[in-house]
């Protein structure tokens, strides 16, 4: 692993430090200020007649980003999480320590500098070193002298390296953290209680997806990584909680692309004595809150598309297929005509697909990508909504919506099915679909039906994909850009290292 000549040179320098009685991985030294705090606190120094303040002494830490050696002195750019700060190190103050520094210090090393604030002739606020310590010797050279890491695969596989050399990546994940904390704060302010439900399920449920399977040795049974927390959260509504939410991971054993990762983060929330129409209004308030918190305008650009949050609309599923998808009503209303139309459009469909699934195929191909501004699509076919409440006026549709923004589904919500007998029949239909070969059809969950039989109040529930939400609000084009360690196909790592020169 460490046979590369450039790594060997650095290992030799680490061993040389040990021979001098210095630990190249020193511990226990503390900084007194972050780099940003130093720059703010001592900004006044640049205005002094003699731009220095020897009465002050601070310790700063960070990674060496740039090193300029000039005879008996050197300038070092040091980066911590907050900012980059320059240090000036001179042989006059450090004597033999300066010689050791020149011999051993390299770009990438993590250091501590203790000294007083001063400004250079060019007016740059810096720290004049009185002490200098290498805290962690880097034995692998960093790429391109911090000019950036452009290999996309390497960025995702070695995210630590990506974070070191690409500051904008760190900014994305700071924004992600702010988005998640803002979502949490919003729901707490709205009166929702945050809860935690199991990550391993005896029966996978809550969504149509293929699960990951594991094995519990003590119980001697298979367990499934959860594909959704929905059925457990609704059990809590049965138990008497009236407004709950959970932010956590879901796992779906499916394909990967720029908007899908098998391990992803969602918020799901359930609201007793409310309907899906209430969720639509709640979602609008959530986005208003997030835009304000992130200081984003109502119009944002995502993937070269202008998304206007002031142009939010609501449209029914069939109306969207007709007015946006361009499919006539007489085709949409007849299953055989719709199948023929899809085949004419060279869309590959299974011959035994139900009417509801044919509509879904048409929607995916002709409508979804055109929904740029926030669009709540309502009145979904009941056949593709096995957990949603049946509409009172039309039993063929569900009281359900999905929110689309920039051509992608962002949220899914509905008035919950709380009739245990209806739910049991729908589970039976799902089992029949699974027996026909539909691996994503849901399993029978008799325990959940039994819970419903104890009475669940009228409830509305919704899920929002956090990763896609972060993509939208940060402009990221791939879900891998907003997940710190995305799923990647394993490769043999040859640990190539190129010269820093």
From Swiss-Prot:
Q: What is its EC number?
A: 6.1.1.6
- Residues engaged in binding Mg(2+) 1: 402, 409
What Gene3D superfamilies would the database entry show? Bira Bifunctional Protein, Domain 2, Nucleic acid-binding proteins
Any one Gene Ontology BP term = lysyl-tRNA aminoacylation
Q: Name one Pfam family in it.
A: tRNA_anti-codon
Task: State its cofactor.
Answer: Mg(2+)
Question: What broad class describes the main subcellular location of this protein?
Answer: cytoplasm
What GO MF terms are annotated?
Answer: ATP binding; lysine-tRNA ligase activity; magnesium ion binding; tRNA binding
Q: Which InterPro entries does this chain map to?
A: Aa-tRNA-synt_II, aa-tRNA-synth_II, aa-tRNA-synth_II/BPL/LPL, Lys-tRNA-ligase_II, Lys-tRNA-ligase_II_N, Lys-tRNA-synth_II_C, NA-bd_OB-fold, NA-bd_OB_tRNA
UniProt-annotated binding residues for Mg(2+) 2: 409
Which Gene Ontology cellular-component terms appear in the entry?
cytosol
Keywords, sorted A to Z: Aminoacyl-tRNA synthetase, ATP-binding, Cytoplasm, Ligase, Magnesium, Metal-binding, Nucleotide-binding, Protein biosynthesis
The cofactor remark states: Binds 3 Mg(2+) ions per subunit.
Q: Which reaction does it catalyse?
A: tRNA(Lys) + L-lysine + ATP = L-lysyl-tRNA(Lys) + AMP + diphosphate
Q: Where in the cell is it found?
A: Cytoplasm
Q: How does it assemble?
A: Homodimer.
Of which family is this protein a member? Belongs to the class-II aminoacyl-tRNA synthetase family.
Q: What is this protein called?
A: Lysine--tRNA ligase
Species in which this protein is naturally found: Helicobacter pylori (strain Shi470)
Recorded name of the encoding gene: lysS
């Amino acid at each position: 692993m460490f046979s590369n000549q450039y790594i060997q040179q650095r290992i030799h320098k680490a061993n040389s430090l040990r021979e001098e009685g210095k630990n190249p991985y020193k511990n226990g030294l503390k900084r007194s200020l972050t780099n940003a705090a130093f720059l703010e606190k001592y900004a006044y120094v640049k205005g002094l007649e003699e731009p220095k303040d020897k009465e002050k002494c601070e310790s700063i830490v960070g990674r060496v980003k740039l090193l300029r050696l000039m005879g008996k002195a050197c300038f070092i750019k040091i980066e911590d999480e907050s900012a980059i700060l320059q240090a000036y190190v001179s042989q006059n103050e450090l004597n033999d320590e300066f010689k050791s520094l020149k011999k051993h210090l390299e770009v990438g090393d993590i250091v501590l500098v203790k000294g007083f604030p001063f400004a250079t002739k060019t007016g740059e606020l810096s720290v004049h070193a009185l002490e200098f310590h290498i805290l962690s010797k880097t034995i692998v050279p960093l790429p391109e002298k911090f000019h950036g890491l452009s290999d996309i695969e390497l960025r995702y596989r070695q995210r630590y390296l990506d974070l070191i050399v690409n500051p904008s990546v760190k900014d994305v994940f700071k924004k992600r953290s702010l988005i998640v904390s803002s979502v949490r704060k919003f729901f707490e302010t709205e009166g929702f209680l945050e809860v935690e439900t199991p990550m391993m399920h005896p029966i996978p449920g809550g969504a149509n997806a293929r699960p990951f399977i594991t094995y519990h040795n003590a119980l001697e049974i298979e367990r499934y990584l959860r594909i959704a927390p929905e059925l457990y959260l609704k059990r809590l509504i049965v138990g008497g909680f009236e407004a709950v939410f959970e932010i956590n991971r879901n796992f779906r054993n499916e394909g990967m692309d720029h908007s899908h990762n098998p391990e992803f983060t969602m918020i799901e929330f359930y609201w007793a004595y409310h309907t899906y129409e209430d969720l639509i209004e709640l979602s609008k308030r959530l986005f208003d809150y997030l835009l304000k918190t992130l200081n984003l305008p109502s119009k944002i650009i995502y993937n070269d598309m202008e998304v206007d949050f002031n142009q939010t609309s609501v449209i029914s599923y069939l109306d969207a297929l007709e007015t946006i998808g361009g499919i006539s009503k007489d085709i949409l209303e007849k299953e055989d005509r719709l199948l023929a139309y899809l085949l004419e459009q060279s869309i590959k469909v299974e011959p035994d697909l139900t009417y509801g699934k044919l509509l879904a195929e048409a929607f995916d191909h002709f409508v979804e990508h055109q929904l740029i501004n926030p669009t709540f699509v309502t009145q979904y076919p009941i056949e593709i909504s096995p957990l949603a409440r049946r509409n009172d006026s039309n039993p063929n549709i569900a009281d359900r919506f999905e929110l689309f923004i920039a051509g992608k589904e962002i949220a899914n919500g509905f008035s919950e099915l709380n009739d245990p007998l209806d739910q049991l029949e729908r589970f039976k239909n799902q089992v029949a679909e699974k027996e026909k070969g539909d691996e994503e059809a849901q399993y029978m969950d008799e325990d959940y039906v039994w819970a419903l039989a104890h009475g669940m109040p009228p409830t509305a529930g919704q899920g929002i994909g956090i990763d896609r939400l972060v993509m939208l609000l940060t402009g990221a084009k791939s879900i891998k850009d907003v997940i710190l360690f995305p799923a990647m196909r394993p490769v043999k790592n040859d640990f190539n290292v190129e010269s820093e020169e």
